[in-house]
Curated annotation (Swiss-Prot):
Keyword Transferase: yes
Origin superkingdom: Bacteria
Organism encoding this protein: Acaryochloris marina (strain MBIC 11017)
Its EC number(s): 2.6.1.83
Residue positions where N6-(pyridoxal phosphate)lysine is found in the record: 249
Descriptive protein name: LL-diaminopimelate aminotransferase
Family affiliation: Belongs to the class-I pyridoxal-phosphate-dependent aminotransferase family. LL-diaminopimelate aminotransferase subfamily.
SUPFAM superfamilies per UniProt: PLP-dependent transferases (SSF53383)
Pathway per the UniProt entry: Amino-acid biosynthesis; L-lysine biosynthesis via DAP pathway; LL-2,6-diaminopimelate from (S)-tetrahydrodipicolinate (aminotransferase route): step 1/1
NCBIfam families: DAPAT_plant
Molecular function terms, GO-annotated: L,L-diaminopimelate aminotransferase activity; pyridoxal phosphate binding
Subunit structure: Homodimer.
Encoding gene (name): dapL
Length: 409
């Protein structure tokens, strides 16, 4: 009989968001008339920018004409999109990133997991706690961890607690770790990192030969000019960091699927024989073998983000969600809850009232207010006693959800 990858059996009972979906579905089935408002999973609600829609319609027409039809595209992405990304998102901020170092993909979630294909099995790995579950679960699937303990922590991972006491920015570890996952603006806490904090991480990584896996999926929500948008704004980062970005939240591409990963050509890691190997070459080989590229139509839509109209429309989208976050922050703070995040990020991180557990607060809100959020404990042991509320919804739903919650605390 064929055998399985036993590492999957080490995963906790259910990925966080499917478990939320299961509980919400059970509640909805028992209460079919309940007006449920979902502020849990970070999915957008507003339509794609008109500039993107128009570009995609034109691209569809291209596919209907023999002269402009496109078949397989470059696995790395079309040059016209990569050039615009390099110029606007990186070079305009003083980052030394070339278009040839950018790989277009169908999601940063995929890339965060797939990047492990080019790293060895013996690397030590550090994640913050709480943390986006994908970083942990993909390492479990790849066999990089031992079993899970009662607190949900996996043997073999180095957990770096982030909490109100350290302003939700992890302390540099005293021991050497090889791969370091950082996410700023942070999911789930909404925290941001100063330039000096990121410089400390880069200095650590360079001194230990470590690689930083930097998730910048929410960088477009940064409004503070002192906060870096990219790890490559930090001196030395090209020698120790890979960056992931996405069009999902800034341009509403959660259902359209387009993202990017930057792998500098100067970035090296060790082979078993102690020789230095360019990670760019490995990632390029991996993508060329396992990925056929993002749809031409979708890439044209992403390119339109960088047009004058696209920039104005995406800015309006971001401002809309940030205003939602402001409403959530202000209403819950006024109701007496301790609230974090939601300023340079679309997530608000709330301390649960009266010391109740994260899942108990989830059930309380669902049953009393018909509002869905995300239990902090689902992001790690240090998330217990916290709750994430997403700003991704309509203004009317956000205002109604806050009315219900504040009336039932």
């Amino acid at each position: 009989m064929a055998t399985i990858n036993d590492n999957y059996l080490k995963l906790k009972a259910g990925y966080l968001f499917p478990e939320i979906g299961r509980r919400v579905s059970a509640f909805a089935e028992a209460n079919p008339d309940a007006p449920i408002i979902k502020l849990g999973i970070g999915d957008v609600t507003e339509p794609l920018p008109e500039a993107c829609r128009s570009a995609m319609v034109t691209a569809v027409e291209d596919m209907g004409n023999r002269d402009s039809f496109k078949g397989y595209g470059p696995e790395q992405g079309y040059g016209w999109l990569r050039e615009k990304i390099a110029a606007h998102d990186f070079q305009a901020r003083g980052c030394d990133v070339d278009a040839g170092e950018i790989f277009i993909s169908d999601g940063s979630k995929c890339d965060c997991g797939n990047i492990l294909d080019i790293f060895g099995d013996n690397n030590t790995i550090a994640v913050t706690d709480p943390v986006y579950p994908v970083y942990v679960d993909t390492n479990v699937m790849a066999g990089h961890t031992g079993p899970c303990n009662d607190q949900g922590e996996y043997e073999g991972l180095t957990y770096l607690p982030i909490n109100a006491g350290n302003n939700f920015t992890a302390q540099i570890p005293s021991q050497k770790v090889d791969l370091i996952y950082l996410c700023f603006p942070n999911n789930p806490t909404g925290a941001v990192a100063s330039k000096s904090h990121l410089q400390d991480w880069v200095n650590y990584a360079k001194s230990h030969g470590s690689i930083i896996l930097f998730d910048a999926a929410y960088e477009a929500f940064i409004t503070d000019p002192e906060i870096p948008h990219s790890i490559y704004e930090i001196e030395g980062a090209r020698d120790c960091a890979i960056e992931f970005r996405s069009f999902s939240k800034n341009a509403g591409f959660t259902g359209t699927r387009c993202a990017l990963t930057v792998v500098p050509k100067t970035l090296m890691a060790k082979a078993a024989d102690e020789s230095d190997v360019e990670l760019w070459k490995l990632w390029n080989r991996r993508q060329s073998t396992k990925f056929n590229g993002v749809s031409y139509i979708v890439q044209r839509g992403a390119e339109a983000v960088y047009s004058e109209a696209g920039q104005a429309q995406t800015k309006a989208l971001i401002s809309f969600y940030l205003e939602n976050a402001k409403i959530i922050r202000e209403k819950l703070t006024a109701a007496g809850l301790q609230v974090f995040g939601g300023v340079n990020a679309p997530y608000v991180w709330v301390q649960t009232p009266n010391g109740i557990s994260s899942w108990d607060f989830f059930d309380q809100l669902l049953h009393k207010t018909n509002v869905v959020g995300t239990p902090g404990s689902g992001f790690g042991a240090a998330g217990e006693g916290y709750f994430r509320i997403s700003a991704f919804n309509s203004r009317a739903n956000v205002e109604e959800a806050m009315r219900r919650i504040t009336a039932n605390l």
